[in-house]
Structures are given as structure tokens and as C-alpha cells.
UniProtKB/Swiss-Prot annotation:
Disulfide bond sites: none
Organism whose genome encodes this protein: Campylobacter lari (strain RM2100 / D67 / ATCC BAA-1060)
Any one GO molecular function term: structural constituent of ribosome
Keywords, sorted A to Z: Ribonucleoprotein, Ribosomal protein
SUPFAM superfamilies named in the record: L35p-like
Family: Belongs to the bacterial ribosomal protein bL35 family.
Name of the protein this chain belongs to: Large ribosomal subunit protein bL35
Biological processes per GO annotation: translation
InterPro entries cross-referenced by the UniProt entry: Ribosomal_bL35, Ribosomal_bL35-like, Ribosomal_bL35_CS, Ribosomal_bL35_sf
Gene Ontology CC annotations of this record: cytosolic large ribosomal subunit
A Pfam match: Ribosomal_L35p
């Protein structure tokens, strides 16, 4: 049986670490002038994929 192909868009969006999957924040592409500096600072940091979505992301990444 051939190996499963990973979803290339998912590979670009997620990074796999030690037992966790990191993701970037949304709401940072445009219309940034009305967003406060504190919110922009918080959006800069990377987050972890929520436990309810881990299984789906792992399937996309071929893990």
C-alpha cells in the first residue's frame, strides 16, 4: 500500500514539536489599524492546536 500524502497547505501552516502541534494566529493579515497594540502583541505569539482538532490535523499531516 502506498504512503499517504500529506496536505501541503497543512504542512505550511503547522509545526510539529514534542507531542504538540503549533499554529500561527489568525486575524493578522489586514485591517490592523483598528486593533489595539496589546491584541497585536498577543496575536504575534504562536499557539497550540486545541485537543479537539489534533486528530484531524495529524491526519492532514500524515502523522
Amino acid at each position: 500500500m502506498p504512503k499517504m500524502k500529506s496536505v501541503k497547505s497543512a504542512v505550511k501552516r503547522f509545526k510539529v514539536g514534542k507531542n504538540k502541534i503549533k499554529r500561527g494566529s489568525a486575524f493578522r493579515s489586514h485591517i490592523l489599524t483598528k486593533k489595539p497594540a496589546k491584541r497585536m502583541r498577543d496575536l504575534r505569539t504562536s499557539k497550540y492546536v486545541h485537543s479537539t482538532n489534533v486528530k484531524a490535523v495529524e491526519k492532514m499531516l500524515g502523522i
